[in-house]
Amino acid sequence: MSVLQWVCLAVVVAATVVGVALFSRGVVAIVRTVRIGRVAPGRSGPVGTRLATLLREVVGHGRFQHRPVVRVAHWVVMVSFPLLVLTLVAGYGQVVSPTWALPLIGHLWPVEWVVEAFAWAALLGIVALFVLRLRISPRAAAPEVERRRSRFFGSNQAQAYFVEATVFAVVAAVLVLRGLEYALLSQAGETGLGLHFPLTAWFGGFWAGGSTAALETAVVVAATVKIVVSMSWFVVVGLQPTMGVAWHRFLAVVNVYARREPAGGPALGPLVPLTLADGTAVDLAALEDLPDDARLGAGAIEDLSWKQLLDTATCTECGRCQDQCPAWATGKPLSPKLVMLSLRDHAAATAPYLRATAAAGAVTEGTAAPVDRRAAVEDDPHAGVDLVAAGVIDPDVLWACTTCGACVQQCPVDIEHVDTIVDVRRYQVLMESAFPKELGGTFTKLERQGNPWGLPARARLDWAKGLDFDVPVVGADVESAADVDYLFWVGCAGAYEDRAKKTTRAVAELLHAAGVSFAVLGDGETCTGDPARRAGNELLYQMLASQNVEVLNEVGAQRIVVTCAHCFNTISREYPQLGGRFTVLHHTELLNTLVADGRLVPVEPGADAGAGGGTVGQRITYHDPCYLGRHNQVYTPPRELLAAIPGAELAEMPRNRETSFCCGAGGARMWMEESVGTRINATRAAEAMSTGADVVATACPYCTVMLSDGVAAVAASDGGADGTAAAGPGAEPVGTDAPAGPTSPAGPDRGPAGGAPARASVGVPEVADIAVLLRDSLRAPTL
């Protein structure tokens, strides 16, 4: 060995020892931080299902489906990482002997083909990702409003560029080494090298004229550079366990494996149950037995589960959640990404103190008698630090969330933002009684009257007045819900809100026309509890939900049809947690089946003039309700229903299906003022109006209310009669940033008929539920 080789060997050995040691230190720090979290039940099995899901996610990269370039680029870079580790191992041998190769597989041409193919692909992929980041990164000199439009706003760009530069340097070194190996073997008279160097022989040939000594020196230097760069990455990453853009390479595998849904799918639909520190679910029956020091929800960092802490460590700061968040898009301070980063940094700073205190208190001084570790931790000033009071999560951030699930849907590493935000809300509501003042009235109305409007139960059947047929009530007109085809769950909005009543009446008329027998509960209904649960009042939710489950079981409910997407999600996805298991259909699903079966027949344009066809020949755009679409994957039936209306033209908004933009009502936001930034409903209404649609079709009463008011607000701000000024996706309509007023759906004291009319003026698109549009398109004699 030459002097250079000895020097290079010493350098790579030292770099490796330091790199591996510091990287191991980082691993230990992350594991210890995650372990301060609470138990997260059900995250380990079934193993086979979870492994299959993990493999499918890794191979398919399904969360990147709307970004094909990023999908391919990220995939090849990701796959090259473990594949090219073999070249790193070979590099150590090349420092000692430039012609050294891995035993057995070192000169197998299939292996060499794979190495070269992925090396080139990774090089192109990392360049593409670098250019993309450079192109959409926020400009430092730009105003904040403009910088916020970048999904990388708030991300650590220096760390990201470091990671990308490291990948580029390592992959480039691999290719250079391959070319130098070709040149060395060519000088040695080897034949058939084209088979072994399929993608590097073309430039390796340029070096074949060099001397053997020079080529061997070049191999040693290139191998040393590759190893030192790799170990430098390990050093930097090991020293920064909060560097998610690097650590996600390892943590994402664990996070995806431990996802909430073992068979796949995002953590949407039902919320995780409220649990104690040991993972025991909290219900109404267990409240009396709770210890005095029990903490409900996530008030401090140690109240989060280990999976929630792993979520924060895994965040790669890609900003896809931020890019899709309706609150962030309308100028509010909530960014799901920044919430995760804030929790991550706080956990990393707090965990060492919590661990040290727990360890010190594990054994009484001078004895072997064990003591309560948690009690010892609670004496530490770093323990129990209120996440909101300490400024880790600002109240405006916490309460801006609509729980639409866009962040969860977009996250490529399965972070469960909504569950974490609601857990923090639970603590604030249940333990601190700290919540927006409007919610106080909503909670009271839910508790006393069983609906957020605060109206009497006897008014729940007012919507049926004037129908030319009787609506049977279970217990009065029919003995059991099992005696009819469907129990029609009307919901609070469908019973009390004037615009939603139109949907309720339309569904009843359509079911009657199709010969489907149904009955309602009348004053036996109460709110499903969705607004209480999303607002963090889990105990009020359980009170309402338990009452409903008991009633539904008593009346023998088997098949239930609902018009509200929130009721649909709660009854079908959350009531099973309380023992209520029913077959639940959204009205668009049932009506679509009835149309497909020929039991409902929309009229052709011009047929039976004056007898129907009120919406035919019109341009319709459809708004996907979050709790029907993203949370429950119901996208096709509503569109098939619209397609069944003769002459109707469907004009999709730019943001539709999985990427649909929230109306602003979810997460109990329907009952809170919206005084920060632009109104979400107006932004969505502007996007709908930009399609040139005559009708904005909805499939949820909350969406109908919010978009009706949004359309009216946009039309008023335009100042014109047509109200159809172009407004692209994400546009912020002028004049729609005022606080919610008496015509807004956001006030707790808003009456059942509050808000602007569905059609505010001539030329302004109508906002109507699909059921209303379908009913209007049928022949009058049918109804």
Predicted regions, residues:
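Cysteine-centered loop/knuckle micro-motif
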Residues: 325, 411, 707
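Iron-sulfur-cluster electron-transfer modules
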Residues: 2-135, 303-312, 334-340, 347-579, ...
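Membrane-embedded alpha-helical bundles of multi-pass integral membrane proteins
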Residues: 1-292, 297-298, 337, 341, ...
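Acidic/polar loop patches that form or flank catalytic/metal-binding clefts of enzymes
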Residues: 247-250, 263-266, 333-334, 420, ...
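Short, charged low-complexity linear segments at domain edges
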Residues: 270, 276-307, 345-391, 636-645, ...
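Cysteine-cluster motifs in flexible loop/terminal segments that predominantly coordinate metals
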Residues: 318-321, 407, 665-666
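Iron-sulfur cluster-binding electron-transfer modules in prokaryotic oxidoreductases
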Residues: 173, 179, 205-212, 216-217, ...
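Segments forming glycine/polar-rich beta-alpha architectures that bind adenosine-containing cofactors
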Residues: 233, 316-319
